[in-house]
């Protein structure tokens, strides 16, 4: 059908908004997705196809339904960050969750609990700004990795971070030759990263340079200016390879403070290393932790923490267990977990094991771990792709009694739960929204092994 439409212009009206917050229309049964659109918007659609590429569509707005909500950011639709500032938050949350609700009702006969965001702006604790010649400091353009949208402020990061961004923009304007030019392969500075704790006052600023900038006269001069102009508690220079588009990774030089910042979650102190992952919105993630705290049984001895990272869940719920086993593939994160647990809970039998859970080699280790006792509670927080075949297979034959499945991708989570439906019974599900203005959600499912009796 699409071949017949190629190079012809058709008209399509947006019929609804999907869970990715994109408007959906149709041309002769061919679905089109249109960002930043709403039901009632009309577009001219021209399909075209280049050699060896998938068919694409050129969109031209014909008419737009009246907007009741004005995007507060002037860069909206140009910046690739937010995608829903044209939609009221109430409608955003409904669009993001409605299909999940219906599918859980249909497939599992269960209705998830929904917890909308309490803060819709100024919530994010980390932003990475690309630095381009100009100087231009901003985010990637929507749909393009090569172009940058210059930003004076960002409405989803903290106000303290925006103040530091303002100071940096004033500073870098005096060094026009410092930004790295991706085309000519000249210059030095690639990224400006801000990390602001939510439950402490600490702010970290990280500047990522090409390796050749290290130990130069220019570096020393710029270091002195940064110390005078920037106000963060921790200021770091980071050096990595010239062609790499990775921020806040590589060899570091500490100009001020430490190479980690302090965050508090559930009353526990976390040292967050400059290059490590941490929940982007700890306040928005709190409902997940409250849910687990409420549902964890008191009479169980052993917590298994899969995809444990630096022991986030282990440390928060350690007071309920006698033994903790954490598993992850990144040794540096495991070292942090071991150190923190030995300091906080020296009497708990804790071990953190390096295992690649997406490797076939993990199967035998997981099956031994999961068959050791029916007094085990499992918490798993996998990446967006889900648990993976080897974890799923091990769970099917396991003695794990209670399982908390935390996910940043409820769609892949639901697919995994379907594969486990003959072995575990879903007790409750919570879906929450730590990421307003974007299509992302967080969820937690509480499962009980079907043949387990208390």
From Swiss-Prot:
The keyword Metal-binding applies. Pfam families: tRNA_U5-meth_tr. It is an enzyme of class 2 (transferase). Keywords: 4Fe-4S, Iron, Iron-sulfur, Metal-binding, Methyltransferase, S-adenosyl-L-methionine, Transferase. [4Fe-4S] cluster binds at residues 73, 79, 82, 154. The active site is at residue 408. It comes from the Bacteria. GO terms for biological process: rRNA base methylation. InterPro entries: MeTrfase_TrmA_AS, NA-bd_OB-fold, PDGF/VEGF_dom, SAM-dependent_MTases_sf, U5_MeTrfase_fam. One of its GO terms (molecular function) is rRNA (uridine-C5-)-methyltransferase activity. One of its GO terms (cellular component) is membrane. S-adenosyl-L-methionine binds at residues 279, 307, 328, 381. Its EC number is 2.1.1.-. Belongs to the class I-like SAM-binding methyltransferase superfamily. RNA M5U methyltransferase family. This is Uncharacterized RNA methyltransferase LA_2977. It comes from Leptospira interrogans serogroup Icterohaemorrhagiae serovar Lai (strain 56601). The lineage of its organism: Bacteria, Pseudomonadati, Spirochaetota, Spirochaetia, Leptospirales.
